[in-house]
From Swiss-Prot:
Keywords: FAD, Flavoprotein, NAD, Oxidoreductase. Belongs to the GMC oxidoreductase family. This is Oxygen-dependent choline dehydrogenase. It comes from Yersinia pestis. Gene3D superfamilies: FAD/NAD(P)-binding domain, Glucose Oxidase, domain 3. The active site is at H473 (proton acceptor). Pfam families: GMC_oxred_C, GMC_oxred_N. GO terms for biological process: glycine betaine biosynthetic process from choline. FAD binds at residues 4-33. Its EC number is 1.1.99.1, 1.2.1.8. The lineage of its organism: Bacteria, Pseudomonadati, Pseudomonadota, Gammaproteobacteria, Enterobacterales. GO terms for cellular component: membrane. GO terms for molecular function: betaine-aldehyde dehydrogenase (NAD+) activity; choline dehydrogenase activity; flavin adenine dinucleotide binding.
């Protein structure tokens, strides 16, 4: 089998490339995916409110675990990644957040990445998006990704939590992806007008499937990329449960879109990576690149949970006898509780004036439960998910063998810097001050977690070590740039070889301020134009917020109540 391009991974980036490259009728593309189809009748992946279900099994989840994390009580921590058409867009939380404009301006300040500024990237965000309330300078109206905005009449806790954030002295913003990310406001989601998950399989692949120049093979686990000298020429993969070896060849390029965990593994198994590691595993060296698998970053987060004095939370939706009605309304009408991911409000703040753009993110949820669906509080409640955005901590990914079925060694090195501890302590204390504001007086019950007894630095640190969790945002493990630890250039081309690119979240040089899916799609849209030889989209001239000397907050309406005095 020979194609012009072989794409490894039908995820958030790979599906974008498959759709865009096959717009050229004379180009042939093979798309390889280790998982299976995105079954449209499987509520676990298609119903937004069921987002916890895919993380509880292995049909759609690689279910990686980290090595014992030394600063987190040596816990082996979850590292769920999507498996199947859609990749992690098939199992993520569907929060449509692009990051802060300053993230991209920072990227563009790095040598070789000058065309990755916010105004360079904004046209590609717009190209990918169809927002349900229409386009503007920041949002698109004709893209493959359906974006739904919160509507009047949604849960009153969303509005109360945003109002509390403003009363605590932080800005309000009406669009976390618009002129000003900083502040509290409504949160958009990747959900279709019919209440279905808007994965890239639905948005991009559905457009491309009818084309004769696209071949999709599922249950195809990539073993390694093949080379002739320094040129990538094809892919060796294992097909089906039997693991039958197959080979496909690429006339032009191999495009690696495996994500921040799989892409460095595949490069290392193919002979591209740290020379010492490859020699130890008897992997023939094609190109020594010490940065492959290094610079690994993620977002860590915690939940602060409270009981709710009024019966307005989503707790009844967790009870089995209410779920058939919710499911029927969603299935036939695409409406109701099932049609939302229930992350309809959130925000970004600076915990201290020293930060030039937000370093803390909030997701508000009108129920008290872990992200993966475990440990649901058996009463009406609500919670704030809070975590730092740009930790200085850096991890790494290393293959353990040549076997593509063996999971790699993953170490994020969470909380390995003093800044991490300052930020998370600040985050807990600021959250308590937000929850104490008058807007939440009608709803705020007792603090369930961390609890009134967790107050001083040592107590907060112990809570963080034991309870902080991944936000499922691994990135940066094959970073763009031209320094000695860079893996690819600003167009995703792997240094030192020909005919090979990496296009996914792994090539971010630094993690962004927010959820990764929208930005991963943007990266793929931008590089797709490069691959096709298209003129880049014209740079935007939209104005955007820069904090400058603006204080991180003003005086709160109410200074924090002692935790023990909460009603």
């Amino acid at each position: 089998m020979e194609y012009d391009y072989i794409i490894i991974g039908a995820g958030s980036a790979g599906n974008v490339l498959a759709a865009r490259l096959t717009e050229d009728a004379d180009v042939t593309v093979l798309l390889l995916e280790a998982g299976g189809p995105d079954y449209r009748l499987d509520f676990r992946t298609q119903m937004p409110a069921a987002l916890a279900f895919p993380l509880q099994g292995k049909r759609y989840n690689w279910a990686y675990e980290t090595d014992p994390e030394p600063h987190m009580n040596n816990r082996r921590m979850e590292c769920g990644r999507g498996k199947g058409l859609g990749g992690s867009s098939l199992i993520n939380g569907m929060c449509y957040i692009r990051g802060n404009a300053m993230d991209f301006d920072h990227w563009a300040s790095l040598s070789g990445l000058e065309d990755w500024s916010y105004l360079d990237c904004l046209p590609y965000f717009r190209k990918a998006e169809t927002r349900d309330i229409g386009p503007n300078d920041f949002h698109g109206g004709e893209g493959p990704v359906s974006v739904t905005t919160p509507k009047i009449g949604n849960n009153p806790l969303f509005h109360a939590m945003v109002a509390a954030g403003v009363q605590a002295g932080y800005p309000r913003t009406d669009d976390l992806n618009g002129y000003q990310q900083e502040g509290f406001g409504p949160m958009d989601r990747t959900v279709t007008p019919k209440g279905r998950r808007a994965s890239t399989a639905r948005g991009y692949l559905d457009q491309a499937r009818p084309r004769n120049n696209l071949t999709i093979i599922t249950h195809a686990l990539t073993d390694r990329i093949l080379f002739e000298g320094k040129r990538a020429t094809g892919v060796r993969y294992l097909k089906g449960d039997a693991g039958t070896g197959q080979t496909a060849y690429a006339r032009r390029e191999v495009l690696l879109c495996g994500g921040a965990i799989a892409s460095p593994q595949i490069l290392q198994r193919s002979g591209i990576g740290p020379a010492e590691l490859l020699q130890r595993l008897d992997i023939p060296l094609v190109q020594a690149l010490p940065g492959v698998g290094e610079n690994l970053q993620d977002h860590l987060e915690m939940y602060l949970q409270y009981s709710c004095k009024q019966p307005v939370s989503l707790y009844p939706a967790l009870l089995w006898f209410n779920q058939p009605k919710i499911g029927i309304e969603w299935l036939f009408n695409g409406t109701g509780v099932g049609a939302s991911n229930q992350f309809e409000a959130g925000g970004f703040i600076r915990s201290r004036d020293a930060f030039t753009w937000p370093n803390i993110q909030y997701h508000f949820l009108p129920v008290a439960i872990n992200y993966n669906g475990s440990n649901a509080v058996k009463e009406h409640g609500f919670q704030a998910h809070v975590g730092s955005m740009r930790s200085p901590s850096r991890g790494r990914i290393q293959v353990k063998s040549k076997d593509p079925r063996q999971h790699p060694s993953i170490l994020f090195n969470y909380m390995s810097s003093e800044q991490d501890w300052h930020e998370f302590r600040d985050a807990i204390r600021i959250t308590r001050e937000i929850i104490a504001q008058p807007a939440l007086d009608p709803y705020r019950g007792r603090e369930i977690s961390p609890g009134a007894n967790v107050q001083n630095d040592d107590e907060l640190d112990a809570f963080i070590r034991e309870h902080a969790e991944t936000a499922y945002h691994p990135s940066c493990s094959c970073k763009m740039g031209d320094d000695k630890m860079a893996v690819v250039d600003g167009q995703g081309r792997v240094h030192g070889v020909q005919g090979l690119r990496v296009v996914d979240a792994s090539i971010m040089p630094q993690i962004i301020t927010g959820n990764l899916n929208a930005t991963t799609i943007m990266i793929a849209e931008k590089i797709a134009d490069r691959i096709r030889g298209c003129q880049p989209l014209a740079k935007s001239n939209a104005a955007y917020f820069i904090a400058g000397d603006t204080p991180a907050r003003t005086s709160p309406v109410r200074h924090s109540l002692p935790v023990t005095s909460y009603p």
